[in-house]
């Protein structure tokens, strides 16, 4: 029985954690049976389990070793800190993109990266095939015959323990992250039909929604509730069009889907037992089975997602995928943790996993095989499914080099791809200058960032009913309306496409609920007016507007702040609200159409904003926001207070928007006094005569 445990912490450093009894010296035995004495370099007896540090000659990484003491007690030499040393990546970076299973009717090739494993075998359809070690930690086996649809997994020994995992490079699996399935890639490879008009990022209007929330409401009458197929349905309710046709009518340009990869916590064979948004990744390259018609069919989840995206493309709607490469679900059980313990995550100086994500683990994107895995995964989602962009959850956890390479390699596949994410600064064990957070935006010109400055300023100021921030601060209305590019405050972003302007998303309370939570005695009409104003400002600001599904018809989640695992009754889109909100929706459709037709509302360059935009407070309760270029001028008057405000317009103009009226084209003569209702805004347009 072993009285100590041995760890390989560097190529020439073994650490012995000894038990109550130990007898020197120590010996190292290779799996070929060779025995060598290892001298003690230093020892520590500060505790009852003091350590010995041994200095063997540099070991051949990947082999299995055993350490003995003088009485024959032994311990497998565990690969520990060595897996996070540069020598490990230098030795075991596998550069090929052929990991996984590759099928033809005559044979299927299986390749698996497991650099410190022994006795690796493929288990397929109740048969076992030993795999052969190749270069850089790879293993492979070639099976003759037709294996299409076959279920398989890998078994191996690592650090003395037997392991069994699915294939982390697989494209399909049995339900609930079960065995991987052999796929004929020819059956899932198709021409990608993109939206006809390719847009600049500032022309995008993003609409965030969940596959499940979109179609689960019983009263709405979807035939495939909670499924990929439900995303393309257009039922009617009281003659009002719902679903897919509603999205087209609204006029948005992009939909952002909450996670659609295989995630944990929802039973794919009985999805109604539990609800989850899906921010708990299990298989990054496999679509979520609970959204498929049959989670055990090798092709259903793949083809149904492909068909959905193609349908959106045919309707000139682009599709963005919400991806979560910053942490995994159940870190100890995750495939790469089973393959190379301690490699896939970041650790602090005490040898504990960092937890910047607050999910128990932070993915170490800077490590060679992790970086390669993330890039390959993203490229498959673009080339096989046709995704038009990615929203990176907790992007500030990921490193700049990885994100830069992602942008470069994805643009080689699809030049117009749009990339953005949550750029929060988080403590994750890497220096801040290495991380892809919003304060490093200048080094990440290819990425957009959710603007918490915009979100918080709009919501808090509207609750207060008066100006809150000092002039030229990062959170002043003047700065956030101009995309924080430095016109009227600190330059947070370099270009407007980096500013994702939003006040509501799946996280936190909806705006409609927020105003109730902040002002318990608020009247319903004021709650609605503030919610409308917040949404409209998203579309009037420079940058990229982002709308949470249902926000336009006062989405509520029962005043809950975090509904990631709460019932469908709270998370579902309430389509029955549509008939009651026709005035609001019709106005929003007109505002969206106007933004799409008016280049001044979506300037493409930071310098243009600095040259053409201005924002001034007329009082503590209302402001004027102007965009003037050449002979054209837009004037937007915003009243954040609960009392009517007035403004005397200095030139001849046309009043275009005054809620609930749009496209008014009402002449406004010079000097006319305008009334701006509480919690509302006006938009005027003028074209100056040529000199």
Where are the language model's segments positioned?
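The feature marks proteins involved in alpha-glucan
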Residues: 2-10, 45-105, 130-230
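Carbohydrate-binding surface patches
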Residues: 2-3, 104-111, 116-118, 614-650
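Beta-strand-rich binding/interaction modules
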Residues: 26-28, 110-112, 117-126, 644-661
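Conserved, mostly hydrophobic/aromatic
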Residues: 112, 154, 209, 257, ...
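C-terminal beta-strand-rich structural cap/linker in extracellular carbohydrate-active enzymes
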Residues: 149-150, 668-691
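Conserved alpha/beta catalytic core and glycan-binding cleft of carbohydrate-active enzymes
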Residues: 174-183, 407-408, 412-554, 559-560, ...
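Substrate-binding/active-site clefts of carbohydrate-active enzymes
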Residues: 212-385, 405-414
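Glycan-recognition and catalytic regions of carbohydrate-active enzymes
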Residues: 543, 547-560, 570-634, 643
């Amino acid at each position: 029985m072993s009285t100590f445990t041995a760890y390989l912490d560097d190529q020439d450093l073994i650490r012995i954690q000894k038990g109550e009894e130990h007898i020197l010296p120590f010996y190292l035995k290779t799996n070929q049976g060779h025995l060598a004495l290892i001298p003690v370099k230093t020892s520590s007896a500060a505790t009852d389990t003091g350590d010995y540090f041994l200095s063997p000659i540099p070991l051949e990484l990947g082999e299995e070793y055993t350490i003995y003491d003088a009485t024959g007690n032994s311990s497998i030499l565990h690969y520990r800190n060595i897996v996070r040393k540069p020598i490990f990546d230098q030795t075991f970076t596998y550069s090929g993109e052929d990991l996984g299973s590759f099928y033809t009717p005559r044979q299927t090739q299986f390749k698996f990266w497991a650099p410190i494993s022994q006795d690796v075998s493929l288990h397929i359809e109740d048969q076992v095939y030993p795999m052969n070690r190749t270069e850089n930690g790879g293993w492979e086996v070639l099976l003759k015959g037709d294996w299409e649809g076959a279920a398989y997994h890998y078994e191996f020994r690592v650090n003395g323990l037997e392991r069994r995992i699915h294939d982390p490079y697989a494209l399909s699996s049995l339900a609930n992250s079960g065995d991987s399935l052999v796929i004929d890639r020819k059956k899932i490879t198709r021409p990608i039909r993109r939206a006809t008009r390719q847009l600049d990022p500032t022309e995008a209007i993003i609409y965030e929604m969940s596959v499940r929330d979109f179609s689960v409401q019983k009263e709405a009458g979807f035939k495939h509730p909670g499924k990929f197929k439900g995303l393309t349905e257009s039922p009617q309710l009281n003659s009002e069009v719902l679903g897919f046709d509603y999205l087209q009518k609204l006029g948005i340009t992009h939909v952002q889907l909450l996670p659609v990869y295989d995630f944990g916590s929802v039973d794919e064979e009985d999805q109604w037992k539990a609800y989850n948004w899906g921010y708990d990744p299990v298989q990054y390259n496999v679509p979520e089975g609970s959204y498929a018609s049959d989670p055990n069919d090798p092709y259903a989840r793949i083809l149904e997602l492909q068909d959905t995206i193609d349908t959106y493309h045919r309707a000139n709607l682009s599709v963005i995928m919400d991806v979560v490469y910053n942490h995994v679900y159940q870190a100890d059980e995750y495939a790469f943790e089973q393959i190379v313990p301690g490699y896939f995550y970041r650790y602090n100086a005490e040898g504990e996993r960092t937890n910047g994500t607050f999910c128990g683990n932070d993915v170490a994107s800077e490590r060679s095989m992790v970086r390669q895995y993330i890039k390959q995964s993203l490229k498959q989602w673009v080339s096989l499914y046709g995704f038009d962009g990615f929203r990176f959850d907790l992007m500030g956890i990921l490193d700049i080099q990885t994100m830069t390479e992602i942008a470069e390699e994805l643009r080689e596949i699809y030049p117009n791809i749009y990339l953005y994410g949550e750029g929060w600064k988080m403590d994750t064990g890497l220096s801040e200058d290495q991380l892809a957070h919003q304060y490093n935006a200048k080094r990440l010109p290819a990425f957009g960032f959710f603007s918490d400055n915009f979100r918080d300023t709009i919501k808090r100021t509207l609750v207060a009913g008066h100006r809150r921030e000092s002039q030229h601060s990062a959170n002043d209305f003047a700065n956030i309306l101009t995309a924080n590019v430095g016109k009227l405050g600190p330059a947070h972003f370099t270009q407007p496409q980096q500013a994702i302007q939003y006040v509501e998303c799946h996280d936190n309370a909806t705006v409609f609920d927020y105003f109730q939570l902040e002002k318990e005695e608020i009247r319903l009409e004021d709650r609605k007016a503030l919610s409308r104003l917040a949404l409209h400002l998203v579309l009037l600001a420079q940058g990229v507007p982002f709308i949470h599904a249902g926000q336009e018809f006062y989405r509520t989640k029962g005043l809950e702040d975090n509904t990631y695992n709460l019932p469908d009754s709270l998370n579902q889109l309430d389509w029955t609200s549509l008939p009651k909100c026709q005035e609001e929706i019709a106005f929003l459709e007109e505002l969206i159409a106007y933004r799409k037709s008016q280049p001044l509302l979506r300037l493409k360059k930071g310098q243009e904003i600095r040259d053409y935009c201005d924002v001034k407070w007329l009082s503590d309760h209302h402001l004027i926001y102007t965009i003037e270029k050449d002979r054209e001028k837009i004037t937007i008057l915003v009243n954040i207070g609960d009392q009517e405000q007035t403004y005397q317009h200095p030139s001849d103009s046309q009043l275009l928007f005054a809620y609930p009226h749009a496209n008014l084209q009402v002449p406004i003569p010079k000097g006319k006094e305008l009334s701006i209702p509480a919690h509302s805004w006006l938009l005027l347009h003028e074209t100056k005569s040529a000199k």
